[in-house]
Design a protein with these regions (language model features):
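Short amphipathic alpha-helical segments, especially helix-boundary/capping motifs
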Residues: 3-7, 24-28, 122-130
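Short glycine-rich anion-binding loops that position phosphate/pyrophosphate groups of nucleotides
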Residues: 14, 71, 126
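Glycine/Thr-rich phosphate-binding loops of Rossmann-like dinucleotide-binding domains
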Residues: 17, 75, 129
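Short loop/turn elements that form and flank the Walker-type P-loop nucleotide-binding site
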Residues: 2-3, 36
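Active-site phosphate-binding/coordination module
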Residues: 20-111
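Asp-based phosphoryl-transfer active-site loop
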Residues: 3-22, 41
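Conserved acidic, metal-coordinating active-site core of Asp-based
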Residues: 105-135
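Generic detector of short, well-ordered, non-transmembrane alpha-helical segments enriched
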Residues: 9, 61-63, 117
């Protein structure tokens, strides 16, 4: 036990390309790494997105995963901490007004994304990329 090293990794842009899934080649290498070391993950993404990116096998092999920048913490499938903060209605109205009055015309949907302990706001949005819908 004394020789086990502890490592902390970000997910987006470190273990995976931003907002994409882990590559099959790197999956094999990193899974083995999690078998031999104590691995912790810290990410701004929620648990669902993190599971999509790195797979349940790697996620559950990590000692602890800090989702939503530490506001939603898991050890395997067990939620060990969740920040109960909620977006105040006045702030949500302000963000909606900013969205409504913005002159930026390109919109992808999912502009106000509530997460444990945080909110993600984007005029562009985090919905489907318009280029994905083109044929």
């Amino acid at each position: 036990m004394g020789n086990v090293k502890k490592f902390i990794f970000d997910v987006d842009g470190t273990l995976t390309p931003s907002r994409k899934k882990i590559t099959p080649e790197f999956f094999d290498e990193f899974f083995q790494f999690t078998e031999e070391n104590d691995v912790y993950l810290v990410t701004g993404s929620d648990r669902g997105k993190t599971l999509e990116q790195i797979t349940p096998e790697i996620y559950n092999n990590c000692k602890r995963v800090y989702n939503c920048s530490g506001s939603d913490v898991y050890e395997g499938d067990k939620n060990v901490y969740r920040d109960d903060w909620e977006l105040p209605a006045a702030v949500e109205r302000f963000l909606q007004d900013e969205l409504d009055f913005s002159q930026f015309t390109l919109r992808n949907g999912n502009h106000i994304e509530r997460r444990p302990g945080a909110v993600n706001f984007s005029i562009l949005g985090r919905g489907k990329d318009p280029s994905e819908g083109r044929e």
